């Protein structure tokens, strides 16, 4: 079974080819760098900084503790320029590499699916060739989604009904490498019955996909309700 969680464009396919060509250690370095840049704390710091020298930690294939904590301060750090030299590809390919990593991580962060299914999608749909690289992405994804799933399973969410929904529009700079490129982001602001604020940030395609998913869910609910109504009024049930 394939799910519609990501669209692979020609540019994305070219970026994936670059990913496949990277040595494993370089791959994990770029993976964790991109992940750190997408985290709220780093993004906030980047917005107030005029320098490009953002650091990233490296990891090795053998050191499992590093992969569990990719931002460990005991590991060597690289600036963006040093990372570009480490990757060793032309600048345009390096920019495409960062954007492809960012695209993949952003898309998998918006879906909660079985790890085995995501593993198959990374292998078959994205055509990642190295199983170790696929496993590294999976471990990072599991580490990020586990707290979310634990929170959803906690008792305090059982009656946590959404009572209010609002929205606003933000503009963000897409990367350090292309300061002039800005992306409009829709922010859905929801308030629960217990007073908790939930903010979800999405691009226009992601917002459209969310809308289509809601439409699909509503269609299935309507169909189930129609079947239930038909069954209740059938001659055999009277």
From Swiss-Prot:
For this protein, the record's CDD domains field holds:
Commd10
Which residues are in the COMM domain? 161-225
Per the record, which residues fall in region Disordered? 43-78
Q: Name one Pfam family in it.
A: COMM_domain
Deletion phenotype? RNAi-mediated knockdown is adult lethal. Conditional RNAi-mediated knockdown in muscle cells is also adult lethal; adults show severe mobility defects, reduced flight capacity and don't survive beyond day 5 post eclosion. Conditional RNAi-mediated knockdown in neurons or specifically in motor neurons reduces adult viability.
> In this entry, which stretches build a coiled coil?
none
Its GO biological process terms?
motor behavior
- Tell me which positions the record assigns to the signal sequence: none
Feature: compositional bias, Low complexity? 43-77
Provide the assembly information: Component of the commander complex consisting of the CCC subcomplex and the retriever subcomplex. Component of the CCC subcomplex. Interacts with Smn; along with Sbat and Hez may form an accessory subcomplex involved in SMN complex function.
Additional notes on this entry = 'Valette' is named after a Grand Master of the Order of Malta and distinguished warrior, Jean Parisot de Valette.
Q: Which family does it belong to?
A: Belongs to the COMM domain-containing protein 10 family.
Q: What does this protein do?
A: Scaffold protein in the commander complex that is essential for endosomal recycling of transmembrane cargos; the commander complex is composed of the CCC subcomplex and the retriever subcomplex. May modulate activity of cullin-RING E3 ubiquitin ligase (CRL) complexes. May down-regulate activation of NF-kappa-B. May have an accessory function in the survival motor neuron (SMN) complex. Required for neuromuscular function and organismal viability.
* PANTHER family according to UniProt: COMM DOMAIN CONTAINING PROTEIN 10, COMM DOMAIN-CONTAINING PROTEIN 10
Q: What is this protein called?
A: COMM domain-containing protein 10 homolog Vlet
Native source organism of the sequence: Drosophila melanogaster
């Amino acid at each position: 079974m394939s799910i519609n969680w990501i669209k692979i464009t020609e540019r994305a396919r070219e970026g994936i080819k670059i990913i496949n060509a990277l040595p494993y250690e370089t791959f994990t370095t770029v993976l964790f760098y991109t992940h750190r840049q997408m985290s709220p704390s780093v993004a906030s710091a980047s917005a107030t900084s005029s320098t490009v020298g953002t650091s990233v930690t490296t990891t090795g294939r053998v050191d499992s503790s590093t992969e569990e904590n990719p931002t460990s301060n005991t590991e060597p750090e690289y600036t963006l320029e040093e990372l570009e030299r480490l990757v060793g590809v032309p600048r345009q390919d390096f920019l495409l590499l960062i954007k492809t990593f960012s695209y993949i991580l952003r898309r998998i962060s918006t879906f909660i699916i079985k790890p085995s299914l995501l593993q198959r999608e990374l292998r078959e749909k994205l055509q990642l060739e190295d199983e170790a690289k696929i496993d590294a992405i999976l471990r990072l994804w599991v580490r990020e989604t586990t707290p979310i799933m634990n929170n959803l399973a906690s008792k305090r969410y059982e009656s946590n009904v959404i009572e209010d929904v609002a929205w606003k529009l933000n503009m963000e700079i897409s990367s350090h490498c292309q300061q002039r490129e800005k992306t409009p982001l829709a922010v859905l602001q929801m308030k629960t019955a217990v007073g908790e604020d939930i903010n979800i940030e999405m691009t226009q395609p992601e917002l459209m996909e969310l809308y289509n998913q809601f439409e699909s869910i509503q269609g299935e609910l309507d169909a189930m309700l129609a079947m239930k109504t038909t069954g209740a009024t059938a001659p055999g049930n009277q």
